[in-house]
């Protein structure tokens, strides 16, 4: 999978003002930027280099969208608004020739995709790691837990289900973050035992392209 998404400029992150806004030094000026990610984003710290895309609308209070933040030797893509686009490209490669529909409802949830009217797909983006282990979530997520419970329910109803996890930073394997959200971790392992397929893909960003480079394994829980 390769998706072109060039950043328009680079800045220096200064502070997070609210859930969706932050301040960065852009072209020598303190500038309000939009953060399209509801997670805590622990890697978003003062002084980090960030990649930004100019907002398409001049009516917004924030003139720039945060795309990626510097972390060690790479830029980590953090704009969750592109998760479905990236996932859709990956699914086209995983299921060639299949009919892929987006935003399909099942019971009380709306899943990201439905493949050939029989496989529900939910997508999660991961931007946090510890000691080479990618972890999701980085903040408690009632919505995320509910989505996985509904995937389990869909399997019981005769459908197939896939949890597709996109890991945007260098990692060796993936684990649910039980320290941050024990309930999510429990339902994650229950989903595996209940027949929900879980695929984890590493996605890199170089300021020009988003590329899925490899499939990661699920770590053994300690």
Swiss-Prot record:
Domain of life: Bacteria
InterPro entries documented for this protein: SfsA, SfsA_C, SfsA_N
Annotated GO MF terms: DNA binding
Name of the molecule in the record: Sugar fermentation stimulation protein homolog
CDD domains: SfsA-like (cd22357)
Source organism of the structure: Thermotoga petrophila (strain ATCC BAA-488 / DSM 13995 / JCM 10881 / RKU-1)
One protein family per Pfam: SfsA_N
Primary gene name: sfsA
Gene3D superfamilies: 2.40.50.580, 3.40.1350.60
Family: Belongs to the SfsA family.
């Amino acid at each position: 999978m390769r998706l072109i998404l060039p950043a328009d400029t680079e800045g220096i992150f200064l502070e997070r003002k609210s859930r969706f806004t932050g301040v960065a030094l852009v072209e020598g000026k303190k500038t309000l930027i939009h953060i399209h990610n509801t997670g805590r984003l622990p890697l978003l710290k003062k002084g980090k280099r960030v990649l930004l895309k100019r907002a398409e609308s001049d009516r917004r209070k924030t003139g720039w969208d945060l795309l990626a933040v510097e972390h060690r030797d790479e830029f980590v893509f953090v704009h969750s608004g592109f998760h479905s686009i990236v996932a859709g490209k990956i699914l086209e490669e995983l299921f060639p020739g299949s009919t892929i529909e987006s935003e399909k409802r099942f019971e009380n949830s709306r899943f990201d995709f439905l493949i050939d009217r029989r496989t529900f797909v939910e997508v999660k983006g991961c931007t946090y790691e510890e000691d080479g282990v990618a972890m999701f979530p980085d903040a408690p997520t009632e919505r995320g837990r509910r989505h996985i419970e509904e995937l389990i329910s869909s399997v019981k109803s005769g459908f197939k289900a896939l949890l597709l996890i996109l890991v945007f930073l260098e990692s060796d394997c993936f684990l649910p973050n039980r320290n941050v959200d024990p309930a999510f971790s429990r339902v994650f392992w229950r989903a595996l035992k209940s027949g929900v397929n879980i695929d984890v893909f590493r996605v890199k960003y170089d300021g020009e392209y988003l590329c899925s480079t490899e499939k990661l394994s699920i770590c053994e829980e300690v």
